[in-house]
């Protein structure tokens, strides 16, 4: 989500949600597995730092990207930030609900606010992502 983690730490709120059943990237994206597909979104920490999200652009549907590559941008009232894939693969779907109402990301970041679905190239990349406890250490 954002490469400048150190700048975010000073603004961390203690009530952020980090579900234990998800994996996380150091760029502040979360990932959950549904079969051979990864569902990806930004973390509660990321959305809290961005503020009110007004537009999400994912021009990469149908493309195959490597883990760590930019798959889209997230525009908030105060900034625009790149979104990075935590796992590589083909982007098979962009969340139409987020396209219609980007504020869903702020309201339900781990549910209806998911961003993309990716058919993973290498499922082992998922295993290499951060656990909830490790992600909490990163942001805390």
Tell me what each language-model feature is:
Residues 22-25, 82-88:
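Short coil-to-beta-strand transition motifs
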Residues 44, 78, 87:
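A short beta-strand motif that forms part of the nucleic acid-binding face
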Residues 47-48, 61, 90-91, 97-98:
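Short, charged/polar surface micro-motifs in flexible loops or helix N-caps
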Residues 2-73, 103, 107-140:
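Acidic, low-complexity mobile loops and tails
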């Amino acid at each position: 989500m954002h490469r400048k983690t150190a700048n975010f730490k000073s603004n961390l709120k203690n009530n952020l949600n980090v579900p234990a059943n998800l994996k996380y990237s150091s760029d502040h994206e979360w990932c959950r597995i549904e079969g051979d597909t990864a569902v990806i979104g930004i973390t509660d920490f990321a959305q809290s730092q961005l503020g009110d999200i007004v537009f999400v652009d994912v021009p990469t549907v149908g493309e195959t990207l490597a883990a760590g590559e930019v798959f889209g941008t997230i525009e908030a009232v105060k900034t625009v930030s790149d979104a990075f894939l935590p796992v590589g693969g083909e982007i098979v779907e962009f969340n139409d609900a987020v396209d219609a109402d980007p504020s869903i990301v702020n309201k339900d970041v781990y549910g209806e606010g998911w961003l993309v679905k990716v058919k993973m190239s290498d499922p082992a990349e998922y295993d290499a992502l951060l656990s909830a406890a490790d992600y909490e250490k990163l942001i805390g």
